[in-house]
Protein backbone atom coordinates (compact mmCIF):
# COMPACT_ATOMS: atom_id res chain seq x y z
CA UNK A 1 0.00 0.00 0.00
CA UNK A 2 2.82 2.41 0.76
CA UNK A 3 4.27 1.96 -2.71
CA UNK A 4 0.90 2.63 -4.35
CA UNK A 5 0.43 5.71 -2.18
CA UNK A 6 3.87 7.05 -3.04
CA UNK A 7 3.39 6.50 -6.76
CA UNK A 8 -0.08 8.05 -6.54
CA UNK A 9 1.32 11.19 -4.87
CA UNK A 10 4.14 11.50 -7.39
CA UNK A 11 1.97 11.04 -10.47
CA UNK A 12 -0.82 13.29 -9.17
CA UNK A 13 1.59 16.12 -8.37
CA UNK A 14 3.16 15.75 -11.82
CA UNK A 15 -0.22 15.78 -13.59
CA UNK A 16 -1.38 18.83 -11.63
CA UNK A 17 1.92 20.63 -12.26
CA UNK A 18 1.65 19.93 -15.98
CA UNK A 19 -1.81 21.52 -15.90
CA UNK A 20 -0.43 24.44 -13.85
CA UNK A 21 -2.83 23.53 -11.04
CA UNK A 22 -1.97 23.58 -7.36
CA UNK A 23 -2.88 20.61 -5.20
CA UNK A 24 -3.60 20.42 -1.47
CA UNK A 25 -2.36 17.78 0.93
CA UNK A 26 -5.95 16.60 1.47
CA UNK A 27 -6.45 16.23 -2.28
CA UNK A 28 -3.27 14.14 -2.50
CA UNK A 29 -4.37 11.89 0.36
CA UNK A 30 -7.89 11.44 -0.97
CA UNK A 31 -6.67 10.50 -4.44
CA UNK A 32 -4.10 8.11 -2.97
CA UNK A 33 -6.78 6.37 -0.88
CA UNK A 34 -8.96 5.92 -3.97
CA UNK A 35 -5.95 4.73 -5.97
CA UNK A 36 -5.07 2.15 -3.29
CA UNK A 37 -8.63 0.79 -3.28
CA UNK A 38 -8.80 0.53 -7.07
CA UNK A 39 -5.31 -0.96 -7.41
CA UNK A 40 -6.00 -3.67 -4.83
CA UNK A 41 -9.43 -4.34 -6.28
CA UNK A 42 -8.29 -4.68 -9.88
CA UNK A 43 -5.66 -7.24 -8.87
CA UNK A 44 -8.49 -9.61 -7.86
CA UNK A 45 -10.42 -11.81 -10.27
CA UNK A 46 -13.90 -11.12 -8.90
CA UNK A 47 -14.19 -7.37 -8.34
CA UNK A 48 -17.72 -7.48 -6.96
CA UNK A 49 -17.08 -10.02 -4.20
CA UNK A 50 -13.63 -8.61 -3.38
CA UNK A 51 -14.70 -4.97 -2.98
CA UNK A 52 -16.16 -5.26 0.56
CA UNK A 53 -13.06 -7.05 1.85
CA UNK A 54 -10.70 -4.52 0.26
CA UNK A 55 -12.78 -1.64 1.66
CA UNK A 56 -12.70 -3.18 5.11
CA UNK A 57 -8.95 -3.74 5.04
CA UNK A 58 -8.20 -0.21 3.84
CA UNK A 59 -10.80 1.89 5.59
CA UNK A 60 -12.45 0.24 8.61
CA UNK A 61 -9.65 0.49 11.15
CA UNK A 62 -6.95 2.81 9.85
CA UNK A 63 -3.86 3.29 11.96
CA UNK A 64 -2.32 6.74 12.03
CA UNK A 65 1.14 7.67 13.23
CA UNK A 66 1.21 8.89 16.83
CA UNK A 67 3.32 11.93 16.01
CA UNK A 68 0.82 13.58 13.64
CA UNK A 69 -0.32 17.10 14.37
CA UNK A 70 -4.06 17.58 14.86
CA UNK A 71 -4.28 19.06 11.35
CA UNK A 72 -2.46 16.11 9.80
CA UNK A 73 -4.60 13.62 11.70
CA UNK A 74 -7.79 15.38 10.60
CA UNK A 75 -6.58 15.36 6.99
CA UNK A 76 -5.95 11.60 7.03
CA UNK A 77 -9.29 10.90 8.72
CA UNK A 78 -11.14 13.08 6.21
CA UNK A 79 -9.41 11.42 3.26
CA UNK A 80 -10.10 7.95 4.66
CA UNK A 81 -13.79 8.62 5.24
CA UNK A 82 -14.34 10.26 1.87
CA UNK A 83 -12.49 7.48 0.03
CA UNK A 84 -14.48 4.84 1.90
CA UNK A 85 -17.74 6.53 0.94
CA UNK A 86 -16.62 6.76 -2.67
CA UNK A 87 -15.44 3.14 -2.73
CA UNK A 88 -18.83 2.02 -1.40
CA UNK A 89 -20.58 4.00 -4.12
CA UNK A 90 -18.33 2.52 -6.81
CA UNK A 91 -19.21 -0.95 -5.56
CA UNK A 92 -22.92 -0.23 -5.43
CA UNK A 93 -23.16 1.61 -8.76
CA UNK A 94 -20.67 -0.33 -10.88
CA UNK A 95 -19.07 -3.44 -9.43
CA UNK A 96 -22.29 -5.05 -8.18
CA UNK A 97 -23.57 -4.82 -11.76
CA UNK A 98 -20.39 -6.02 -13.48
CA UNK A 99 -19.75 -2.56 -14.94
CA UNK A 100 -16.01 -2.30 -14.35
CA UNK A 101 -15.39 -0.46 -17.62
CA UNK A 102 -17.98 2.18 -16.70
CA UNK A 103 -16.33 2.53 -13.30
CA UNK A 104 -12.94 3.09 -14.93
CA UNK A 105 -14.47 5.79 -17.12
CA UNK A 106 -15.82 7.53 -14.01
CA UNK A 107 -12.49 7.18 -12.22
CA UNK A 108 -10.68 8.91 -15.08
CA UNK A 109 -13.09 11.84 -14.81
CA UNK A 110 -12.82 11.85 -10.99
CA UNK A 111 -9.03 11.98 -11.22
CA UNK A 112 -9.20 15.27 -13.12
CA UNK A 113 -11.44 17.00 -10.57
CA UNK A 114 -10.13 19.49 -8.03
CA UNK A 115 -10.68 18.76 -4.33
CA UNK A 116 -14.00 20.59 -3.90
CA UNK A 117 -15.42 18.92 -6.99
CA UNK A 118 -14.17 15.51 -5.79
CA UNK A 119 -15.85 15.96 -2.40
CA UNK A 120 -19.08 17.16 -4.03
CA UNK A 121 -19.02 14.21 -6.42
CA UNK A 122 -18.54 11.79 -3.52
CA UNK A 123 -21.43 13.38 -1.59
CA UNK A 124 -23.74 13.10 -4.62
CA UNK A 125 -22.68 9.51 -5.33
CA UNK A 126 -23.18 8.41 -1.72
Where on the chain are the PLM-derived regions?
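Post-HExxH zinc-binding segment in Zn-dependent metallohydrolases
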Residues: 22-61
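Pan-zinc metallopeptidase signature
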Residues: 67-126
